[in-house]
Structures are given as structure tokens and as C-alpha cells.
Amino acid sequence: MMAFPPQSCVHVLPPKSIQMWEPNHNTMHGSSQSPRNYRVHDSQQMVWVLTGNTLTAVPASNNVKPVILSLIACRDTEFQDVKKGNLVFLGIKNRNLCFCCVEMEGKPTLQLKEVDIMNLYKERKAQKAFLFYHGIEGSTSVFQSVLYPGWFIATSSIERQTIILTHQRGKLVNTNFYIESEK
């Protein structure tokens, strides 16, 4: 069996201070918005779990408690590209953990950072590292990094591998996910 070499890892990093803005009567159009929550799995029924500070994909079962993905639209339209999808922030429900793209050892890497998703939403100018294009392909969703165009969130076809960023779609990795609204 061929091993899947990790292309990047998801690690939890300490929070950075975030400059916030206060909504006024001109900017209240989205201030009461809250994230939507989704259960996520890939075509091989792998779900996302948080093991320590690492996000991995494991086969769905009654013994597994998958994370719930929180998703909220970005109000800053600077990086909007309707061909790629909607601009969103991604986080883990009931955790102050958000998906972030950084460069490590010369390669785009997916990380979890200790940030409240609503703080990202309320910022006047969006931080590009936290932004993803949420695209729809058939009945699946794809999440492409805004900071690293052409790099997508992916799971390995081998269980218990770290969730990564990849630019090699369809080669040993899954970049298309089924998301189901959690009520």
C-alpha cells in the first residue's frame, strides 16, 4: 500500500490581536448574521475530527464525533471572484478555531488558529489568510484558498491523515465535500 505523504498539516496557533471595528448605522446590514453550521464528509464517508491540535479525516461511525464546520460569508468584497465561489470564513463550531492558510517551508499550509469566527466577520478589512472561496461542483462543495489560488482543502483517501491544502486535485486526495446543514 502506498503511503500518503502529508503536504501540509493543521496546527492550532495562539491568537493574534485583531483590529476590530464597530458597526454604525451605515454598516449594520450584516451585523446580526451568525455562522451556519454543517456536517462534512467526503466521497469515502470520511469525516473531520479534531485530535489534540490536529484536524484529521476518519471513517464515519457511531464511535466518532466529527467536528461541525462553521461557515460565514465575508462582508469585504475586495477579493470577490464569483467564478470561484462565495467568499467565506471557516471555523469549528463551539471552538474559537478558524481555518487559516500560511506558508511553511515554502509550501501553502492549512492551519487552525485561535480566533473567533465572528471577530473575523466583523473586521472592516478581511484577512486574506482566513478567506476561502466556497465553490459548488455538482452536489459537492470545494474550499479554495484565497491567499493561495489553486490550493484546495483536501482529505487523503487513507484514513487518519491530516487535512491539508493541495493543488493536485483528484490525485490521491479528495477536494470535494458533502456538507449537510446542522439544525
Swiss-Prot record:
The keyword Lipid metabolism does not apply. One of its GO terms (molecular function) is cytokine activity. GO terms for biological process: inflammatory response; innate immune response; positive regulation of cytokine production; positive regulation of interleukin-6 production; positive regulation of T cell differentiation. Keywords: Cytokine, Cytoplasm, Immunity, Inflammatory response, Innate immunity, Secreted. Residues 1-30 form a propeptide. N-terminal truncation leads to a dramatic enhancement of its activity (>1000-fold). Gene3D superfamilies: 2.80.10.50. SMART domains: IL1. Belongs to the IL-1 family. Interacts with cargo receptor TMED10; the interaction mediates the translocation from the cytoplasm into the ERGIC (endoplasmic reticulum-Golgi intermediate compartment) and thereby secretion. This is Interleukin-36 beta. It comes from Mus musculus.
